[in-house]
Amino acid sequence: MKMYYESDVNTDALEGKTVAVMGYGSQGRAQSRNMADSGVNVIVGLRENGNSWNLAKEDGMTVKTFSDAAKEADIIHILLPDEIQEKVYNEQIAPYVEAGNTISFSHGYNIHFGLIKPDEDVNIVMFAPKGPGSRVRTTYLDGFGIPGLVAIEQDATGDALQLALGMAKACGFTKAGVIETTFKEETETDLFGEQAVLCGGLTALINAGFQTLVEAGYQPEIAYFETCHEVKLIVDDIYEHGFGGMWKDVSNTAEYGGLTRRDYVITEETKKGMKKVLSEIQDGTFKKQFADENATDAANLKEMRAAEDQETIEVVGERLRKACGLQKDD
């Protein structure tokens, strides 16, 4: 494993260069502000008068259309949703990309799956924080940062790695450490983590536990606390201290019960399912399905979202969070 820290990196390669951050969502807003505060010349590319246009201006950023930002940029850092990157790149960015420019990402999806295909005379790089945009910004303001990844798909100028690491440092990532990877590895492991564990697997596990208790006659509110609410406490402990630290912090009853009963829940069949998830990422099945979904304006996804909102655990959870003063206004 190759890891880069503050002392390994300087931002000299960025001097005199303009970075155009395309998009101003959670990551776009955080990364552009961090780089600007670190002295990098940053402009933001957006859809004119879109939802983020005024917000970026209020934040003091220089805001331009995608095309105008691409014309001025030496480095084009694309932080748009995966499903619209290809269209925006081909129509509003690619016509203005010049030899020696750098095309940058924080997720390798569109490059790895061949949806965006820059010419051979430009750099293709990635620097990616391992955390949400809110943490990217708050840890930077606290004088630290969150861990990150860096990858080089194409080095046309000979200094692509220095450019990517310079931006990672300007965002604060090298204070925690930046691990070298590849676009393939980042894309496939990121998608797998989201689908099998973090977003798909975890929510399914929580809901199954909740339903098991409710179906056995326990109060839904108690079931929610025991299977959903307390997840954060355990995850925070693992985040800071690992599995070993978590086991030390819970009671002996919880430790013994967890270690002797977890195989009832996560079985070899579960692992077979995880391997299927990974296989469909690797062979392009998921990419095709996601593209087909977006071709229908995400009709199926919208139906699934609506169904999720009606799940008993969601109804009970919202009621409890409000009652306990835990729910923040959107």
UniProtKB/Swiss-Prot annotation:
Belongs to the ketol-acid reductoisomerase family. Pfam families: KARI_C, KARI_N. Involved in the biosynthesis of branched-chain amino acids (BCAA). Catalyzes an alkyl-migration followed by a ketol-acid reduction of (S)-2-acetolactate (S2AL) to yield (R)-2,3-dihydroxy-isovalerate. In the isomerase reaction, S2AL is rearranged via a Mg-dependent methyl migration to produce 3-hydroxy-3-methyl-2-ketobutyrate (HMKB). In the reductase reaction, this 2-ketoacid undergoes a metal-dependent reduction by NADPH to yield (R)-2,3-dihydroxy-isovalerate. NADP(+) binds at residues 24-27, 47, 52, 82-85, 133. Residues 1-181 form the KARI N-terminal Rossmann domain. Substrate binds at residue 251. It catalyses: (2R)-2,3-dihydroxy-3-methylbutanoate + NADP(+) = (2S)-2-acetolactate + NADPH + H(+); (2R,3R)-2,3-dihydroxy-3-methylpentanoate + NADP(+) = (S)-2-ethyl-2-hydroxy-3-oxobutanoate + NADPH + H(+). Mg(2+) 1 binds at residues 190, 194. This is Ketol-acid reductoisomerase (NADP(+)). The active site is at 107. SUPFAM superfamilies: 6-phosphogluconate dehydrogenase C-terminal domain-like, NAD(P)-binding Rossmann-fold domains. The keyword RNA-binding does not apply. GO terms for biological process: isoleucine biosynthetic process; L-valine biosynthetic process. Its cofactor is Mg(2+). InterPro entries: 6-PGluconate_DH-like_C_sf, KARI, KARI_C, KARI_N, KARI_prok, NAD(P)-bd_dom_sf. Keywords: Amino-acid biosynthesis, Branched-chain amino acid biosynthesis, Magnesium, Metal-binding, NADP, Oxidoreductase. Binds 2 magnesium ions per subunit. The gene is ilvC. One of its GO terms (molecular function) is magnesium ion binding. Pathway: Amino-acid biosynthesis; L-isoleucine biosynthesis; L-isoleucine from 2-oxobutanoate: step 2/4; Amino-acid biosynthesis; L-valine biosynthesis; L-valine from pyruvate: step 2/4. Mg(2+) 2 binds at residues 190, 226, 230. Residues 182-327 form the KARI C-terminal knotted domain. Its EC number is 1.1.1.86.
